């Protein structure tokens, strides 16, 4: 049995090539792209400006797998929602929608890049189940479609304004599919999301950061740091044993210099572990004279980790120390803790729900 092509994961030029192979003019491919990513078509049969005969030929070789929402959780504030999505092979992934009703009216989609994660960070739930596989570009797009459908008309329609690759998985270990997704999201004839509104978060894959610096894809870079010494970072984030700070920080500096874009460093404050004054001073020294911003993250509870967060006053004091040293820093708004949708809490919930 021949596997049909999943249209959502194709770039405009790939859809144009498909149209030509099926005996149509290239512009038909761009029409298909608009149906998929501007009109959010759920089936080939609704693409009414395509000739019926072409739609019939297309349906023989291509498909649009349905969005399968297995579970849906809404935070008490109603503004954070977590979806468990079923994939065609029986695996499942989680993604999160965060609605901000401030002056900028942002609707942020937090997307997964892998089923599970191989990084094994000690304070993160995702890695507890290990890595199953990479997601395809289509499966990445599917998450945004599902989250966009969550938005009511009064909340900006189904317009996703921001994309963050901060869900399950390490995006730089699924580089090709993630970058393909980014290019689809950025295309003005579809989602039309500016590169300033697409953020990729990595635990510190140095070759991937160097590739980002060379290729300059349309996105912003965030790096999960969480410690200022190799000794501590080795314990918190095993990837540091492969790419220690003396390799990671210079790679980030080069990225900032080459692209002209600042690097955001994420730092989860863990009580009694990385929250001392000397940690703040070490962080200031590490990032001195770099185009950088520090996001201080309130640690979110993860069963079995043994870690605890710090009181809000302590987090504010830590930020003040960084700012006094000349670093740009702020406390990141943490959303969705009550539905395990916050940073570090996504996992194989399907084992608990189904």
UniProtKB/Swiss-Prot annotation:
GO cellular component terms listed in the entry, alphabetical order: cytoplasm
Disulphide bridges, residue numbers: 110-343
Cofactor binding note from Swiss-Prot or TrEMBL: Binds 1 [4Fe-4S] cluster. The cluster is coordinated with 3 cysteines and an exchangeable S-adenosyl-L-methionine.
Active site: 94 (proton acceptor), 343 (s-methylcysteine intermediate)
Pfam families per UniProt: Radical_SAM (PF04055), RlmN_N (PF21016)
Alphabetized SUPFAM superfamilies for the sequence: Radical SAM enzymes
Enzyme class: transferase
GO terms for MF: 4 iron, 4 sulfur cluster binding; metal ion binding; rRNA (adenine(2503)-C2-)-methyltransferase activity; rRNA binding; tRNA (adenine(37)-C2)-methyltransferase activity; tRNA binding
HAMAP family: RNA_methyltr_RlmN
The protein, known as: Probable dual-specificity RNA methyltransferase RlmN
Gene (name only): rlmN
């Amino acid at each position: 049995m021949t596997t049909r092509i999943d249209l959502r994961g194709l770039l405009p030029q790939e859809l144009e090539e498909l149209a030509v192979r099926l005996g149509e003019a290239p512009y038909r491919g761009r029409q298909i792209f608009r149906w998929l990513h501007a009109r959010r078509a759920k089936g080939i049969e609704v693409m009414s400006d395509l000739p019926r005969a072409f739609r019939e030929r297309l349906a023989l070789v291509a498909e649009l797998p349905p969005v399968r929402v297995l579970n849906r959780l809404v935070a008490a504030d109603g503004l954070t929602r977590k979806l468990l999505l079923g994939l065609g092979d029986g695996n499942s992934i989680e993604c999160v929608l965060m609605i901000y009703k401030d002056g900028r009216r942002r609707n942020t989609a937090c997307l997964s890049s892998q089923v599970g994660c191989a990084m094994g960070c000690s304070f993160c739930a995702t890695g507890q189940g290990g890595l199953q596989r990479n997601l395809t570009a289509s499966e990445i797009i599917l998450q945004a479609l599902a989250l966009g459908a969550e938005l009511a008309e009064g909340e900006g329609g189904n317009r996703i304004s921001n994309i963050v690759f901060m869900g399950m998985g390490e995006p730089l270990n699924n580089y090709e599919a993630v970058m393909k997704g980014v290019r689809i999201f950025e295309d003005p004839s579809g989602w039309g999301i500016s590169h300033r509104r697409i953020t990729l978060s990595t635990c510190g894959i140095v070759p991937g950061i160097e590739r980002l610096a060379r290729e300059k894809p349309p996105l912003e870079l965030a790096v999960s740091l969480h410690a200022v010494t190799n000794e501590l970072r080795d314990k918190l984030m095993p990837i540091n044993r492969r790419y220690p700070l003396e390799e990671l920080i210079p790679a980030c500096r080069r990225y900032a210099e080459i692209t002209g874009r600042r690097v955001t460093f994420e730092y989860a404050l863990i009580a009694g572990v990385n929250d001392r004054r000397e940690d703040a001073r070490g962080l200031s020294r590490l990032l001195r004279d770099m185009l950088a911003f520090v996001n201080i993250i309130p640690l979110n509870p993860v069963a079995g980790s043994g870690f605890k967060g710090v009181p809000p006053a302590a987090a504010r004091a830590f930020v003040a120390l960084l700012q006094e040293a000349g670093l740009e820093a702020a406390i990141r708004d943490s959303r969705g803790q009550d539905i395990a949708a916050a940073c570090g809490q996504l996992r194989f919930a399907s084992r608990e729900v189904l």
